[in-house]
Regions:
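Short amphipathic helix-turn modules centered on a small-residue break
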Residues: 33-51
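Coiled-coil helix of the DHp
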Residues: 20, 49-52, 56-59, 73, ...
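Proline-poor, low-complexity alpha-helical tail modules
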Residues: 1-5, 9-12, 27, 232-286
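Amphipathic alpha-helical coiled-coil/heptad-repeat segments
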Residues: 1-9, 38, 50, 63, ...
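Extended, amphipathic, non-transmembrane alpha-helical segments
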Residues: 19-28, 82-93, 230-240, 244
Length: 286
C-alpha cells in the first residue's frame, strides 16, 4: 500500500475528467440540437454542411425573387386587362362611326369618348409600376418627362431566379412601352365613315399588340411558377440532407448522456473511496 502516490485516486480522477467532458459535449448537443457544435466535432461534416446552408439560403432568396417576379407579371397583366377592355370599347365606337347612319353631332360624341379612352390608356401606360419600376413607360432622369418608345420590345427587367450567377439563372422579363402613340391609336378618327373604317384597322392592330405583350407576361409567369416549384423541392431535399449531417440524433445522444452520467457518478464514488484508502494506514498505526 502506497502513501505518496494514490494511484487509484489518480485513475478515478482522470476517468472523472473524461466523463465530465463527454457529459458537457452531450449537453451542448442536446441543448443546441446540433451534432456538430464546433469544427472539432466533425470537420468534414461541418464543411459540407456550411456549403449546403449557403446553397439553401441562396435557393430561398431566389424563391423570394421569383415571388417578386410573379407579382410584377400580375401587375402588368392586370393593367393590360383594362387596356384590352378599353380597346374593345374603342373598336365598338369605331364600328359605329363606320356606319353612315351617324350625323356629325353623333360623331363628335364618339370622338369625345374615344379621346377619354386614349387618355386613360396613356395614364395606365405611364403610371403602372411595380414598386418604383415603370412597366410600360420610361421617365427621363433629367426632364422627368415620358419618353415613349414603339410598341415593341425595348428592354428587359432581369430577375435572379437561381441560387448563383451562372448562365440560365437570370430570367429577362420583356418590357414594352405602351401608350396611344405606340399603339397608333392617335391615328384614329371617327369624324367620317372612311376614317371610322380605317380606325377599326388601327384598333385591331392595337388589340393584337397588347395580346402579344400579355402573352409575354403569361409566359414569364409560367416560367417563374415552374421554377419556384422546382426550387422549393430542391431546397426541401437539401435541408433534409443538411439536417442528417449537422443535427443531433436525440435518441442516440440521450443514450450517450445517460451512459456518461452513470459512469461519472460511479467515478465520483470510486474517487471518494480511493481517497479514503490512505486512512486505513492510520488504522494500522493505532
Amino acid at each position: 500500500m502506497q502513501v505518496q502516490n494514490n494511484i487509484a485516486s489518480i485513475n478515478a480522477a482522470r476517468n472523472q475528467g473524461i466523463e465530465t467532458g463527454k457529459l458537457k459535449k452531450s449537453l451542448e448537443k442536446l441543448s443546441s440540437g446540433f451534432r456538430i457544435v464546433r469544427a472539432g466535432d466533425d470537420a468534414a461534416g461541418l464543411a459540407i454542411s456550411e456549403g449546403m446552408r449557403s446553397r439553401i439560403n441562396s435557393l430561398n432568396q431566389a424563391m423570394r425573387n421569383i415571388d417578386d417576379g410573379i407579382g410584377l407579371t400580375n401587375v402588368g397583366d392586370g393593367a393590360l386587362t383594362e387596356v384590352h377592355s378599353m380597346l374593345q370599347r374603342l373598336k365598338t365606337l369605331a364600328l359605329k362611326s363606320a356606319n353612315g347612319t351617324y350625323d356629325q353631332s353623333n360623331r363628335e360624341t364618339l370622338n369625345m369618348e374615344k379621346d377619354q379612352i386614349l387618355e386613360e390608356i396613356d395614364r395606365i401606360g405611364s403610371t403602372t409600376k411595380f414598386g418604383e419600376i415603370s412597366l410600360f413607360s420610361r421617365a427621363d432622369a433629367n426632364t422627368n418627362t415620358q419618353l415613349w418608345q414603339p410598341p415593341e420590345l425595348d428592354d428587359t427587367i432581369p430577375l435572379q431566379i437561381g441560387g448563383s450567377a451562372q448562365a440560365g439563372e437570370v430570367l429577362d422579363v420583356e418590357r414594352y412601352y405602351i401608350g396611344s402613340k405606340e399603339l397608333q391609336l392617335d391615328q384614329t378618327n371617327f369624324s367620317t365613315v372612311e376614317k371610322g373604317q380605317k380606325s377599326v384597322e388601327y384598333i385591331e392592330n392595337a388589340i393584337e399588340a397588347v395580346s402579344k405583350v400579355r402573352a409575354s407576361f403569361g409566359a414569364a409567369y409560367m416560367h417563374l411558377d415552374h421554377t419556384h416549384n422546382n426550387l422549393s423541392v430542391t431546397s426541401e431535399n437539401m435541408q433534409a440532407a443538411e439536417s442528417q449531417i449537422r443535427d443531433t440524433n436525440m435518441a442516440e445522444e440521450i443514450t450517450k448522456y445517460t451512459s456518461s452520467n452513470i459512469v461519472l457518478q460511479s467515478s465520483n464514488m470510486m474517487l471518494t473511496n480511493a481517497n479514503n484508502l490512505p486512512q486505513t494506514i492510520l488504522e494500522l498505526l493505532k
